[in-house]
């Protein structure tokens, strides 16, 4: 792996609003960042194998998508304008029963292609046939936290535990350390207490985290309250789930006590504003969570409920949503939205070596081309990234010290083949008996 020197870019480190070098340099040695600073700050003796001219670009950490279902790209536009439970029970779950492992592989490849082209370098995924998901991640060069979704009721409950355990043991730390394997109990309403306790015991024994949907809809709140007399957050806390590293997706319907628990237990939260809006699930109390010190990142959710995987759009939607819903134009300002999409997302995933541009961090970064009419004039770079930038502005993507996209060309994936396979398999899937 050749050392890389990036020169001339405006470097946005994400260590704070003032962490900006207008004529900056980034030295990458192997898969890590060696130095970041103004031009001329590269350590003496550093010999790059290649140099990248960043003139007119902003260099920044790659986006961290904290919650998605990668292979659901195959179901993009298949089921729209429906409430969550009807969407799941009538459209999504029936067609998912017909998915084959190779469908999931190609759906994940399409996901990785789309995410790379829009500047995402790390994502968290929950699905099934996770060995094929991991294979796609390994091939794409991306970084990912992967979990096999587990339904704790019905005939497949035991199989989900067995497959999850096998996956964690085989893939945790895989793909040169780019894959983190987790356990994925689906949600409080699909996982009874005794099942959750089994998952917690396994995760603790294996040293793995947990990825779970939490308090996504009012139906879930009512169901858990009717069955257990409590909230989904308290239900999970009583089962011992929050004693482990946890990524909780959605967290829409929370009371003050729930927020206190999530913050105190250092639960990572994946805020998915566009999916929540589209399914009319509600608006997560993100400003309250942030004020309580919770670790909040952004996620797109799956392409079947978003309908894209564009973190630039997700940032903009998040910031605007919380301004209009609170009546406060200062709610979720641009730097906070950008932090949630980068360093905050890494923190929510428990990844300590991504999300910032500083020495010792993994070399996961992107170059955004600011030589665009919609990014001119450049009074505030951070505001531009959140309110004006588009995915097509992402010029270069580097993951783990390897250039995976340059001048909008993804170097290690066959774009045409991936799209053709995905289109073919998606049509077969929805017509398959």
Curated annotation (Swiss-Prot):
Binding site for substrate: 96, 148, 158, 186, 216, 301
Xref: InterPro entries: Amidohydro-rel, Deaminase_MtaD/DadD, Metal-dep_hydrolase_composite, Metal_Hydrolase, MTA/SAH_deaminase
Record EC number: 3.5.4.28, 3.5.4.31
Binding site for Zn(2+): 67, 69, 213, 301
Superkingdom of the source species: Bacteria
Record keywords: Hydrolase, Metal-binding, Zinc
Keyword Zinc annotated: yes
Cofactors demanded by this protein: Zn(2+)
Family affiliation: Belongs to the metallo-dependent hydrolases superfamily. MTA/SAH deaminase family.
Xref: PANTHER family: AMIDOHYDROLASE-RELATED DOMAIN-CONTAINING PROTEIN, AMINOHYDROLASE SSNA-RELATED
Protein's recorded name: 5-methylthioadenosine/S-adenosylhomocysteine deaminase
Annotated source species: Pelotomaculum thermopropionicum (strain DSM 13744 / JCM 10971 / SI)
Lineage: Bacteria, Bacillati, Bacillota, Clostridia, Eubacteriales
Gene: mtaD
